[in-house]
Each structure stands twice: as structure tokens, then as C-alpha cells.
Amino acid sequence: MNELKSYVFPAPGERVDASHASPETLELLTRRRSTAAINLGEPGPSEQQIEHLLGIAGRVPDHGKLAPWRFILFDGEARASFGNILGKIYSATTPEATAEQIRCEQERFVRAPLVIAVISSVLERHKVPVWEQELSAGAVCQNLLIAASAMGFAAQWLTEWYAYDPDVKDLMGLRSGERIAGFVYIGTASEQPVERNRGRAHIGRWKA
């Protein structure tokens, strides 16, 4: 299950196909659905699969070739350790929190076998606008979701309060100009997600 074939990333300067006609890819994108992190369990990706996931994640539009993102991985015992600290921070900043609410925060990162934090790491004084650099980090998150699904895993992209908490950012070693684009939870679905209502896109055509 979830076996990884031997895929090879192109080398710099190598010519690559401009298009990849693939009904399977269209089917995946047409029916892709996030799975709630609470419904993600073992097994998670192997080390080889994680390496490939991160490689795919970085194959996004990147104005200026800046690669303005980085990853922090949470797996194994590190998930519970980080969760315990989250619980302490939440308890300190939310004095009215109940024991059950604190426990919920402590268990945030053990819901899935693997959590990948995608850090938007922009160059603030670069000619490429910060907004465009941040969009690239968002595309990285989406690539992780799609690649995880293609590997046979389920995933969810979340932020939650701890993506914006200054103490959590310090704990994770974020530098000036860095923001958490999201936490991508990856594992095996314990149940199939149900499709949600999706609003119709507002589409217009510009006319001279």
C-alpha cells in the first residue's frame, strides 16, 4: 500500500514536457477533498515518501527563483512534545480554558502521523513583491495536499490559533519576515470524507 515508484526529478537545464495529458490527474483534482485531521491515522509516509513529497511541494511558480519557504516536520515523539508546549501556551493565554480544552490543544499534533509546517520565508526588500512570494508558499501547501493524495494518503491544510501566536512562532524559530503558511497534516484516512457545498465561482470576461 502507498508504494512509491522510482520517480526522478529533472536536472537543472534539462528540457521537460510542457504538458502531461493525464485523465488520472484530472480525476484526482476533480474529486480531491481534505480529510479532517482527527480522522488521520497510521500509516504515514515513509522517509522516502516524505523526501519526495517535499520535492514535489517545491515545484511551484516562484517569481525570481527565490524559494521563499521552508519546512518544519513534526513526527514521532516530537508531535506530543510540541503539543504539550502548545497546551501550556494555550492555558497561559486562555485562563478560562477548561481541562478538556487544554487537553484538546495538547493533542493537536498527534492526530496525524506527520505534520508539515510550511513557513513563508519572504525577502522583504526584494524587487519581487512580498505578496507574490507568499502566494508561492500557499502553492507549496496545495502541492503537498495533491501529492499526498496521489501517494494514497489523506491530508488537511490547517492554520489554527497557533499559526499566529508569537510564543509559538518563537518556539518554532521563525525569523523576521517569516509567517506560518499552514500546517499540513498527512496520514491514512479512518473514514472517507463527505463532499461539502461549494459556492459557484464569480466569473467575468473583460470587454473593451
PLM segments and residue spans:
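N-terminal amphipathic, basic helical "cap/leader" segment at the start of enzyme domains
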Residues: M1-R111, A208
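Conserved hydrophobic/aromatic beta-strand scaffold that supports enzyme active sites
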Residues: L28, V115-A117, F183-Y185, R205
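Small-aliphatic-rich amphipathic alpha-helix that forms the alpha element of a beta-alpha
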Residues: A57, I116, V122-L171
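Short, charged/polar surface micro-motifs in flexible loops or helix N-caps
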Residues: G76-S81, G87-K88, V122-E124, P166, ...
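A glycine-rich helix N-cap at a beta->alpha junction
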Residues: R108, M172-R198
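Generic beta-strand structural signal
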Residues: A112-L114, M151, I180-G182
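Phosphate/diphosphate-binding glycine-rich loops and adjacent basic-rich segments that engage nucleotide
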Residues: E195-A208
